[in-house]
Amino acid sequence: MKTFTDRWRQLEWDDIRLRINGKTAADVERALNAAHLSRDDLMALLSPAAADYLEPIAQRAQRLTRQRFGNTVSFYVPLYLSNLCANDCTYCGFSMSNRIKRKTLDEVDIQRECDAIRKLGFEHLLLVTGEHQAKVGMDYFRRHLPTIRRQFSSLQMEVQPLSQENYAELKTLGIDGVMVYQETYHEAIYAQHHLKGKKQDFFWRLETPDRLGRAGIDKIGLGALIGLSDNWRVDCYMVAEHLLWMQKHYWQSRYSVSFPRLRPCTGGVEPASVMDEKQLVQTICAFRLLAPEIELSLSTRESPWFRDHVIPLAINNVSAFSKTQPGGYADDHPELEQFSPHDARRPETVASALSAQGLQPVWKDWDSWLGRASQTR
């Protein structure tokens, strides 16, 4: 059975880098006038040459976003269930080598978090854990997902890569979507940053979206950790290749792309390639032109000013008031966090800022009486 690994083996990192850097102003203009972007068009929009065309790129991205999603922007919040991790990764605050306090939420803790989150108004929840199969694996999910699911309209997960059979079971437990980020698509650089644990297996992670697609998960999230490799443009292009593969082979699923830039954390590394804010806007808008129908998400890793200015252009899914540590909504203990969020504003403040720009914050776009995609497909 073919997976994205087959396509990945056809892609040469240095060749893609040279092709992107070789794009000209004429290539960018051609891409801007294309009804549907080709791979070459995307390379042009990710290239240094596109920097001078940021305004027309953003204008077209905004038009496409409004045509597809109207003025709506969906809100979600992450719920961190555990910071236990069996991996040693250079860039993550949860890494097993970091001497931080560890915590896994029990039934009482989870209910306190759910109560606190519901008071904030959120209905869409992203469940996050460190990667620890023994203590925060399927047994843990079987025990606690039913309780959480009853209280929220939509549940998504960002946990360790699992088997196709596990994902099929999670679907029956009420999971609507799974986010899995490759971190970097450069195999050698990936190995430099993943020193111990199951996460060292580059291809197990690379093929996770294929397993999600075969399991029939409704929404699949893709992305790279921008700045981990020495060329963010190539990594972002590889995310696009992964997206195109998934859309072709698992067309029944919906897709989401996120753009996390490397943020400070305990024991963390400095970015190997720096993407500035204009380049992040360029990349987000390029993805909107490539795939007008997908969800583009922007988290609290970015500053309030940046989010307020970029969300109206091409973003249709945002987090707010995120706590990146287990138990953070009921009891805020920053020493447990995975990374330090940049936008710490309360959700109503973020919503007001977007409403002032003519956007409509959406806290809930599904109800249990309608049935769930995870149950009816």
Curated annotation (Swiss-Prot):
GO terms for molecular function: 2-iminoacetate synthase activity; 4 iron, 4 sulfur cluster binding; iron ion binding. It is an enzyme of class 4 (lyase). Its EC number is 4.1.99.19. Residues 71-301 form the Radical SAM core domain. Its cofactor is [4Fe-4S] cluster. Pathway: Cofactor biosynthesis; thiamine diphosphate biosynthesis. Binds 1 [4Fe-4S] cluster per subunit. The cluster is coordinated with 3 cysteines and an exchangeable S-adenosyl-L-methionine. Keywords: 4Fe-4S, Iron, Iron-sulfur, Lyase, Metal-binding, NADP, S-adenosyl-L-methionine, Thiamine biosynthesis. [4Fe-4S] cluster binds at residues 85, 89, 92. The keyword Membrane does not apply. It holds the Pfam family BATS. Belongs to the radical SAM superfamily. ThiH family. Catalyzes the radical-mediated cleavage of tyrosine to 2-iminoacetate and 4-cresol. PANTHER family: 2-IMINOACETATE SYNTHASE. This is 2-iminoacetate synthase. It comes from Salmonella typhimurium (strain LT2 / SGSC1412 / ATCC 700720). The gene is thiH.
